[in-house]
């Protein structure tokens, strides 16, 4: 089995507290980062773990509760400010996340230097 690292950025709370952050994890596999959920404050925790934003190209949102996706628009904006050019893929149940985020991206991240590709994962 191939070695991978799992970074627990937040778990155990829908609300940020002094001891717990809302859910977000990063899997480090084959020199690539895969994020599972992106809660409020996630990008600060990524920096604290010294993970490179440039290695993150895939984000998976488990379900559409705010504590699992409120950090996305800030992270997308930060990527643009850092000069990102590679595509970012975001996977989520159904098409609702793109419907919610696309207007925010168009408004807050107008002229972004990279493409965000949404993938709707069908409900079972």
Which role fits each region the language model picked out?
Residues 1-124:
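Binuclear metal-dependent hydrolase catalytic cores
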């Amino acid at each position: 089995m191939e070695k991978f690292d799992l970074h627990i950025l937040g778990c155990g709370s829908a609300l940020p507290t002094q001891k717990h952050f809302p859910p977000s994890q990063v899997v480090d596999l084959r020199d690539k980062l895969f994020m599972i959920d992106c809660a409020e404050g996630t990008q600060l925790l990524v920096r604290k773990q010294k993970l490179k934003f440039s290695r993150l190209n895939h984000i998976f949102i488990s379900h559409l509760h705010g504590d699992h996706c409120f950090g996305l628009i800030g992270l997308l904006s930060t990527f643009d400010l850092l000069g990102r050019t590679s595509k970012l893929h975001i996977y989520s149940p159904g098409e609702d996340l793109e419907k919610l985020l696309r207007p925010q991206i168009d408004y807050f991240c107008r002229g972004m230097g990279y493409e965000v590709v949404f993938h709707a994962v069908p409900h079972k």
